[in-house]
A protein has these predicted regions:
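Intrinsically disordered, low-complexity regulatory regions in eukaryotic proteins
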Residues: 9-119
């Protein structure tokens, strides 16, 4: 049975943050270079690859390409117009030295490996 996607205001949608938290580059909803972790921390592709080495500075997980929310409302209530991106800019919570040490410590551990496996 096919179930319709709920489209009321209580439906959670991925938070589309407007900027890279590292370099503050604008990342509009259609930005193909936007990357997110499982907590929706948002960075540009350049910072993820060259500064963070695919290590989220907050949770320590890896990154994936952020999905692009459709501009056209193909289904009722589901579009960037109906579910707009956030306008709240987010910035790093840690110093650059701390980020470098954090990344160096865990960058060679795949994000899918649990701590229990490492012990």
């Amino acid at each position: 049975m096919i179930r319709p996607v709920p489209t009321d205001e209580t439906t959670m949608a991925l938070q589309l943050r407007p900027n890279c938290e590292y370099c503050d580059k604008d990342l509009p909803p259609h930005a193909v270079e936007a990357r997110i972790c499982s907590y929706e921390c948002t960075f540009c592709e350049d910072c993820v690859e060259n500064k963070l080495h695919n290590v989220c500075p907050n949770c320590g997980g890896g990154f994936v390409a952020r999905p692009i929310r459709p501009a056209k409302e193909w289904r009722p209530g589901l579009s960037v117009e109906k579910r707009p991106p956030s306008d709240k800019r987010v910035h790093l919570s840690y110093s650059l030295d701390d980020l470098a040490a954090h990344s160096a410590r865990i960058r060679n551990i795949p994000p899918n490996i649990t701590v229990a496996v490492l012990l």
